[in-house]
Amino acid sequence: MDAVTPKKDIPRPDSVRRPSQQEAEEAVRTLIAWAGDDPAREGLIDTPKRVVNAYKEWFEGYGEDPVKYLSRTFEDVQGYDDIVMLRNIEVESHCEHHIAPFIGKAFIAYKPSTAVVGISKLARVVEIFAKRLQTQETMTAQICDAITESLAPMGTAVFIEAEHQCMSTRGVHHKHVTTITTQFTGVFKSDADLRNRFLNMCGQTV
């Protein structure tokens, strides 16, 4: 079967002016005061700096290009003709609506056309998109698009299951509810048996 024609461009965040460290810390002080506490008291005096440094780590995906990690491929696969799959990739992201964490697992697979990529690079792509303000639906599509664009495989499959703290710690306060999102291209979309095999390997009964 022919390889999937990759998309030309993967959506990336628009360019925005990045505030200085001082401006970001001042914004945190404002939120602390708005919450009803004194940002100048001993226990909170260094909190703005700590919060900004945590944001640097949580959202470092904005400074990374996922395609770069998928650019080095290997064509010597010794006749391998099946899917390549990574299971149980840790996902730690933040929803763009409340900046609340959502945490779960990603499962990704592709059926190579002519080349494969180092497996750690696939996990890195998941991490890059997770370390941005996200919706789970968008992140699922972005991961799938990045693999499809870079590797032009015969098909790509992405499955993510996560628990959203914007639902478990606020609002309706429903704990232990998970959200599942999937995206399929190529042979995973056209071949129900292959798609079901992937889902079974994700722990889903189909």
Swiss-Prot record:
Gene Ontology biological process terms in this record: one-carbon metabolic process; tetrahydrobiopterin biosynthetic process; tetrahydrofolate biosynthetic process
Asked if Nucleotide-binding is a keyword of the record, the answer is yes
The alphabetical list of record keywords is: GTP-binding, Hydrolase, Metal-binding, Nucleotide-binding, One-carbon metabolism, Zinc
Q: What is its EC number?
A: 3.5.4.16
* Residues covered by region (Disordered): 1-23
Q: Which reaction does it catalyse?
A: GTP + H2O = 7,8-dihydroneopterin 3'-triphosphate + formate + H(+)
Name the protein family.
Belongs to the GTP cyclohydrolase I family.
Transmembrane feature ranges: none
UniProt pathway: Cofactor biosynthesis; 7,8-dihydroneopterin triphosphate biosynthesis; 7,8-dihydroneopterin triphosphate from GTP: step 1/1
A Pfam family:
GTP_cyclohydroI
Gene Ontology molecular function: GTP binding; GTP cyclohydrolase I activity; zinc ion binding
**Annotated protein name in UniProt:** GTP cyclohydrolase 1
- Could you confirm whether the keyword Flavoprotein appears in this record? no
Basic and acidic residues composition bias: which ranges? 1-17
Which segment of the chain is annotated as a signal peptide? none
Q: Where does Zn(2+) bind?
A: C95, H98, C166
What PANTHER family does UniProt report for this protein, alphabetically? GTP CYCLOHYDROLASE 1 (PTHR11109:SF7), GTP CYCLOHYDROLASE I (PTHR11109)
* Annotated organism of origin: Hyphomonas neptunium (strain ATCC 15444)
Q: Which GO terms describe its cellular component?
A: cytoplasm
- Subunit structure, per the record? Toroid-shaped homodecamer, composed of two pentamers of five dimers.
Q: Lineage in the entry?
A: Bacteria, Pseudomonadati, Pseudomonadota, Alphaproteobacteria, Hyphomonadales
The record's InterPro entries line, in alphabetical order, gives: GTP-CH-I_C/QueF (IPR043133), GTP-CH-I_N (IPR043134), GTP_CycHdrlase_I (IPR001474), GTP_CycHdrlase_I_CS (IPR018234), GTP_CycHdrlase_I_dom (IPR020602)
- Which superkingdom, per the lineage? Bacteria
